[in-house]
Every structure is written in C-alpha cells, then in structure tokens.
C-alpha cells in the first residue's frame, strides 16, 4: 500500500492476508537506497526488506527495469505501423505532447521544441503519439498515431530511437518499451516518477529550454 494512503492502509488492515505490508521503510533501508522514494522502486524495496526479515534470501541488486516484454511479432507490427507514417529509411524521434492537468505543456511550449527538433535533426522523422482525447499541442504538425491497445502503442514507440513526453502513463509505457525516454517535469517530483534505465533521463523544464532538450536528444542519438 502507498504509505500516504489512509484508505489503502485501512483496506490492507481489513484484508485476510497472512502478511501485510503498509509501505514503510526504516531509516537504515532508506540510507542504503537513495532512490527509495521512486514510486516504482519503493514497493520492491519494501517487499525485499520484509522478506529478508522473514528469513528469505533476497536480491540486493538494482530494481529491475519496467518491461512490456514485447515479442518479435509485436515489434515488427509496431515498426510496420510507423513506416506507414514516415520515411522508412530514416530513424524516428517520437513525441507525446499531452498530459493531464497542470502536467500538460501548452502549444506555446511545445511548438518551439518541435521546431528545434526539426531544425537540429533533419535526418530524422518526428512522429507524435496521440492521446484518447485526440489533441495535439503542436497542432498535428507531425504524422500521428493512436491505438486503443497499449501494447500496440508500446511497439510503435519501440520502433523509434527516443521518446519525449511529459510525466504521464504514456511516458511510463515508453520506458517499459525499452526506448530511451526523456520525461518532462515541471510540476511533479521527478525523483518519484522519472523514467529509468535504457538511457532514460528526467528533464526539469523549469531550467531547460528547447535547445538544451535537443542537446540531450543528440547525446542519446549519438549513443544509438
């Protein structure tokens, strides 16, 4: 249970489970894991700590990466869907310009970023994944893709070289597709929600402009 959720703690307390974890770590465990506050890693550390106290041998290594475990057929389908929209001979930068509430960046923010990416990476396609709301903060300037199937979306993103998007479910889906993910953070705490692994990085947009974002993209593409 998330330790800040009182209703969650009550629900767990009333459950019939033999063992119940209420989402708290000791100072000692937190000192061992500087990333303990990350929402994907915290439950793993809690479970490992509990199992260790029960006498089980537990892993000590990094928390495994999120992984959709896309198979070869799904990946091939994702690439085929991408190739329908862009120049197949070029590699692709994938973007998602939507998010909920205050996490959503305005067209005035996104359009300069999009134009900078086009200028800095003329040899790359840029494709946009759309939300269910069918809105684009770049006014549908790039080829767009949408699916009701999250695995199909993940496979589409996996066919790209890098993904850029605000803190959202699609950002985490991109990370789980094993695509290097640039997570944009302006109002939420990146240390709790940042994408991790596979070259993914959080970006504080309060101090990072379009050119700096493009520099980070260039660094990822150069490693590719």
Stretches found by the model and what they are:
Residues 1-224:
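Catalytic machinery of carbohydrate-active enzymes
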């Amino acid at each position: 249970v998330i330790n800040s959720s009182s209703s969650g703690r009550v629900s767990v307390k009333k459950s019939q489970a033999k063992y119940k974890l209420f989402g708290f770590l000791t100072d000692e465990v937190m000192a061992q894991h500087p990333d303990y506050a990350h929402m994907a890693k915290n439950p793993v550390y809690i479970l490992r700590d509990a199992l260790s106290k029960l006498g089980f041998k537990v892993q000590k290594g990094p928390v495994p990466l999120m992984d959709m475990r896309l198979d070869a057929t799904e990946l091939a389908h994702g690439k085929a869907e991408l190739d329908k929209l862009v120049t197949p001979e070029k590699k692709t930068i994938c973007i998602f310009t939507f998010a909920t509430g205050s996490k959503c960046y305005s067209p005035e923010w996104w359009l300069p970023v999009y134009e900078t990416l086009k200028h800095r990476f003329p040899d790359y396609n840029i494709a946009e994944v759309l939300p269910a709301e069918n809105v684009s903060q770049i006014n549908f300037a790039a080829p767009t893709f949408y699916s009701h199937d999250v695995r199909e979306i993940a496979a589409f993103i996996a066919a790209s070289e890098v993904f850029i998007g605000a803190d959202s479910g699609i950002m985490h889906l991109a990370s789980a597709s094993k695509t290097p993910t640039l997570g944009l953070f302006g109002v939420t705490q990146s240390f709790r929600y940042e994408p991790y692994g596979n070259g993914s990085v959080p970006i504080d947009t309060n101090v990072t402009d379009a050119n700096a974002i493009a520099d980070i993209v260039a660094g990822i593409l150069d490693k590719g």
